[in-house]
Amino acid sequence: MPEKTAVLLLQMGGPDSIEAVEPFLLNLFSDREIIKIGPAFLQPFIARRICRKRAPKVEGYYSQIGGKSPIRELTEAQAQALEEKLGGNFRCFVAMRYWKPTTIDALAAIKREGISRVIALSLYPHYSRATTGSSINELKRVLGEAGARFEVSYVDRFYDHPLYIAALAAKIEEGLAQFSNRSEVELVFSAHSLPQSFIDEGDPYLSHILETVRLVMERLGNVNYHLAFQSRAGPVKWLEPSTEEMIQKLAKGGCKELLMVPLSFVSDHIETLYEIDIQYAEEAKGLGIEHFRRSPSLNTSPLFIDCLANLVHKTVSSE
């Protein structure tokens, strides 16, 4: 009987209760690969002060979307769908970078099943050292500290995979179907922002985002589209334009029909359910945009699961 292979899905994670918001934020702001706050030895203390101040506001956001992030349940559903697609020689596990189940939890579960072969598959389509890079480095750190004997391969990007592009285009078509005349719709790809300094230092994130947009628009054809960046925080220069600025610009130009496309997210969480569905929707309405919609997230889209399965099979066959 062939030896089983573990597929470890790497994701950001999110608080599973209101009480978990502050410790989740602390884990996030303590990671120097995503944000550097002062000298390394001071970052934990500065991060704690920042999180204590930010937590009440962020808790309010989560209280409006059910009191927690759905990202764990959705990622576990993706893992289950992928395992069913791959068949009996594969087992799928989830590792969250900033919450539970942690990387240590996931590796312990893999070890309990007696599996030594692991494919670590990042669920961030577009590589950045702040996201995929941080998750992979955390995995390598845990493996080193544990002295665990796993044979690990890494899938760290899939921004141009044909099945990912097809899945994204299909969801956008679902979104466009909510409008009576697609020629009047302004489509806004909204990607998670990143400090401009990352790009200046050679991070490929922006080039990956631009290529995804190009490939998707090749499929969609004649639709007016724009690219913007959401979720920036702090006083440093971030990628531009921001999603808020783009909405304001389109409204000023007379836009009445707007479809938001969450681009760097493969499942629903705070950025889609609160930022887009509540915050940006309210802003758009106040600016006179009459029909504001969002294309559905990929979640367990069969095309997206096919993409993940293909990435796994390609990794296995290349060894």
Swiss-Prot record:
Enzyme Commission number: 4.98.1.1
Binding site for Fe cation: 192, 271
A Pfam match: Ferrochelatase
Enzyme class: lyase
Reaction it catalyzes: heme b + 2 H(+) = protoporphyrin IX + Fe(2+)
Principal subcellular localisation of the protein: cytoplasm
Superkingdom: Bacteria
GO molecular function, one term: ferrochelatase activity
Single biological process term from Gene Ontology: heme biosynthetic process
Pathway terms, separated by semicolons: Porphyrin-containing compound metabolism; protoheme biosynthesis; protoheme from protoporphyrin-IX: step 1/1
Keywords, in A-Z order: Cytoplasm, Heme biosynthesis, Iron, Lyase, Metal-binding, Porphyrin biosynthesis
Compartmental location: Cytoplasm
PROSITE patterns associated with the record: FERROCHELATASE (PS00534)
GO cellular component: cytoplasm
Job description of the protein: Catalyzes the ferrous insertion into protoporphyrin IX.
Family: Belongs to the ferrochelatase family.
Name of the protein this chain belongs to: Ferrochelatase
Source organism: Geotalea uraniireducens (strain Rf4)
